[in-house]
Curated annotation (Swiss-Prot):
Keywords: Ribonucleoprotein, Ribosomal protein. This protein is one of the early assembly proteins of the 50S ribosomal subunit, although it is not seen to bind rRNA by itself. It is important during the early stages of 50S assembly. The keyword Ribosomal protein applies. Residues 131-154 are annotated as: Disordered. GO terms for biological process: negative regulation of translation; translation. InterPro entries: Ribosomal_uL13, Ribosomal_uL13_bac-type, Ribosomal_uL13_sf. Pfam families: Ribosomal_L13. The keyword Ribosomal protein applies. GO terms for cellular component: cytosolic large ribosomal subunit. Belongs to the universal ribosomal protein uL13 family. This is Large ribosomal subunit protein uL13. Part of the 50S ribosomal subunit.
Length: 154
């Protein structure tokens, strides 16, 4: 049996819609990162962008397990002395851009400092509400919540 190395021209990328309402953030991000990289495919090739184009809707309705919504902290630095800032998922989800919780979770599950990972991340579209503008691509609906009972809360 020969090892298959797929060329970029031979890759057929699918469009996928995932409804994130009630989904656990970490489990959703892990699944999406795997699909973005193309590791769910039997002909996966590490140096080729084989992942799907993924659309996530209702990103403002994701959930955290336990008390992580209030107790978890996200840190970033402004670049100035003493410029460490912190925020919580609750503040972000209740704020102006709630989809950033899902975007950052997926981004942090992709490889770091990789041009291919940046290209794969650009195939992710996240929307806070139930509507998206990619109907022309005829995306396939993936029922993430029914894959495992641990994927949802409540």
């Amino acid at each position: 049996m020969k090892t298959i190395s797929v060329k970029p021209a031979d890759v057929e990328k699918k469009w996928v819609v995932i409804d994130a309402e009630g989904a656990v953030v970490g489990r959703l991000a892990a699944y999406v990162a795997t699909r973005l990289r193309g590791k769910h495919r039997p002909d996966y090739t590490p140096h080729v962008d084989m992942g799907d184009n993924i659309i996530i809707v209702n990103a403002d309705k994701v959930v955290f397990t336990g008390k992580k919504r209030d107790d978890k902290r996200y840190y970033h630095h402004t670049g100035h002395p003493g410029g460490i800032k912190e925020t919580s998922p609750a503040k972000i989800l209740d704020g102006r851009f709630p989809e950033r919780v899902v975007e950052k979770a997926v981004l942090r599950m992709l490889p770091k400092d990789s041009p291919l990972a940046r290209q794969q991340y650009s195939n992710l579209r996240v929307y806070a509400g139930p509507d998206h503008k990619h109907e022309a691509q005829q995306p396939e609906v993936v029922d993430f919540k029914s894959m495992n009972s641990k994927n949802t809360r409540g």
